Amino acid sequence: RISQVLGILLDNAISYVPENGKIILSLSQTKTHFLIRVKDNGPGIPDSAKTSVFRRFYRADSARNNRQHFGLGLCIAYEIISLHKGTISVLDTPGGGSTFQISLPLA
């Protein structure tokens, strides 16, 4: 199911980066958690939307013109990560792209 979450995050990144855009997938580990980050240089997510992006059917203003997305992917990703006792969050600077971070406990 983690691969499904990665697919959702990568699909979103691909959909919102400009032509010849940049997407970075990074993996790291702390003593207690495994961290996955998907970073892009798309339009970003406004601060006002950061707490809402994981709600069902929510779409930020920058995503409303993208008709191939229905506002379910991030909600599904959130539920899957929660079932694994992990967290998913968005770190963002509007106009500077988005970074989604997944933190999963090692044990």
Across the structure, where does each feature detected by a protein language model lie?
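Short helix-loop "hinge" at the ATP-lid/N-box region of the Bergerat-fold HATPase_c
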Residues: 13-14
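Short beta-strand/loop element within the Bergerat-fold HATPase_c
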Residues: 20-32
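Acidic ATP/Mg2+-coordinating residue in the GHKL
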Residues: 40
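Short conserved segment of the HATPase_c
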Residues: 45-57
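Short alpha-helical Gxxx[C/S/T] motif in the catalytic ATP-binding
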Residues: 73, 77
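Conserved glycine-rich
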Residues: 85-87
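Glycine-rich GHKL/ HATPase_c ATP-binding element in histidine kinases
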Residues: 96-98
